[in-house]
């Protein structure tokens, strides 16, 4: 990962917390992935903890089965970390169930190893949009979740606007929403009057997602797109952006909230 230009990383093995380590120009954050559930009818939840300062008080057993994902979220926070819902599409989580969870710090909109050829359902944007339309807005994250290391590594990541390369600065930036998820495209968003303007490295698509089912100017497509403009409609409560470059790499913004009430 360092050779591919990464500045920080978290090793999140199942039920094993990797320790934090600071090296020259590279930060390894503590991390682990916790899971509960055996079938989609009762619910399968995987929650990733990042930046914990001690081992979360979690173990498999009756208490976890009863309280499920909420207990994992709470214990990660008690240990000083942030809690991220992993691959909800892969887990077949329903928006109606996810919205009952309290204090999530983010949700994976894309999970590399959940995609072909290793698996299926890597993309969770529809679930995140359904939640946002109901007023439950989660930051959009991307991760490799690399299991095979046959191409599922160094693909999906966060671009974080942090003041320095340290645990506190990275976690603070994530908590404040100063990041976006990407597989390569870089971009920034400008608000001007009632419009959002996206500036990016060259891509083929810039698409605006909202809680409106129809808009005739939400997609800008071409061979070398570097800017797109979207005029926010009066009834829309959120806007988010997705980009795709010439080789299929994508990027995802967080949600921009318009201030309109969710009815």
Predicted regions mapped to residue ranges:
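A metal-dependent hydrolase metal-coordination microenvironment
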Residues: 1-86, 92-103, 108-128, 143, ...
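Short amphipathic alpha-helices and their capping/turn segments at secondary-structure boundaries
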Residues: 129-133
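C-terminal functional module detector
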Residues: 134-139, 144-263
């Amino acid at each position: 990962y360092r050779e591919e230009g990464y500045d920080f990383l978290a090793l999140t093995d199942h039920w094993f917390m990797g320790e934090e380590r600071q090296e020259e120009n590279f930060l390894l954050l503590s991390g682990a992935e916790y899971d509960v559930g055996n079938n989609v009818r009762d619910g399968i939840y995987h929650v990733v903890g990042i930046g914990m300062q001690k081992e979360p008080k979690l173990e498999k057993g009756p208490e976890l089965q009863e309280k499920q994902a909420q207990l994992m979220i709470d214990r990660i926070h008690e240990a000083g970390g942030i809690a991220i819902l992993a691959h909800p599409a892969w887990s077949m989580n329903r928006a109606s169930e996810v919205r009952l969870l309290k204090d999530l710090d983010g949700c994976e909109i894309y999970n590399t190893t959940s995609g072909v050829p290793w698996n299926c359902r890597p993309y969770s944007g529809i679930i995140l949009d359904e939640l946002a339309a109901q007023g439950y807005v989660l930051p959009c994250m991307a991760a490799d979740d690399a299991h095979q290391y046959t191409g599922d590594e160094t693909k999906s990541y966060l671009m974080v606007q942090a003041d320095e390369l340290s645990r506190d600065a990275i976690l603070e930036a994530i908590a404040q929403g100063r990041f976006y998820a990407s597989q390569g495209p870089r971009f920034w968003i400008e608000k001007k009057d009632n419009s959002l303007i996206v500036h990016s490295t060259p891509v083929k698509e810039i698409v605006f997602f909202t809680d409106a089912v129809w808009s005739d100017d939400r997609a800008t497509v071409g061979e070398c797109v570097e800017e797109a403009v979207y005029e926010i409609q009066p009834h829309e409560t959120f806007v988010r952006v997705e980009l795709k470059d010439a080789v299929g790499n994508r990027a995802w913004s967080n949600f921009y909230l318009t201030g309109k009430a969710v009815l």
